[in-house]
């Protein structure tokens, strides 16, 4: 790899708007930051066609038994771990389906692991441990777009035949060149020069929100805008589950509780039972036949 040259990276440029941020009032300081943050959504908007393409291709691969795996270092890696960790409780998927790998391992989530991001070989080792296949998708996260760990991971994933996607915040980056789909919201120089946990991190989080949410919608994990595969693992989520059943079916809380008790708090099954008027076993068979899509299962009944 060529010698590191940060001065040409947008993420490392000095922001002329914030040069005097250390001299202004606290209110003016946060106003400046807020104004800079407003630029993030606009940068992401320019990448929507690529994000949509990624969602469709990832969902297709998951239907074939694949997984979604994020790899990154530092803030980017942590964002991948964060997004992956939210999928099981929100959408009822296994912890294997969406995974986050951070350079340096789990310890690096809480404390920077010096030098880990500079090793392409480490990424290869980490992905080999996951036994990736051509049905998997590897999303490389690197605000700078030059992280060796991410480059190595994407290059190896491509050799295996997996779908490769990059999420960076600099145009025409080395990381992007290794990806089949390159998503690059260019948010401009950071409020604090080079601190990519700020706008760049926010942009990456927005992109990951779209990707994981879009994929889960494509997998039938959402009915209307309700998270129907929610795992009710605590009191708050139990009450949320009841509310979801009520909203989806129009029944009251008492009836929703009764339906959920019958299904061992399988929210989707409870909703489909109420809407289809089928018993538990019949409803489960019909849902399974339609790969868990409530709308498709209901349409099949209506067409008879």
Curated annotation (Swiss-Prot):
It comes from Clostridium beijerinckii (strain ATCC 51743 / NCIMB 8052). This is N-acetylmuramic acid 6-phosphate etherase. Belongs to the GCKR-like family. MurNAc-6-P etherase subfamily. PROSITE patterns: GCKR, SIS. Its EC number is 4.2.1.126. The active site is at residues 86, 117. Residues 58-221 form the SIS domain. The keyword Transport does not apply. Keywords: Carbohydrate metabolism, Lyase. Pfam families: GKRP-like_C, GKRP_SIS_N.
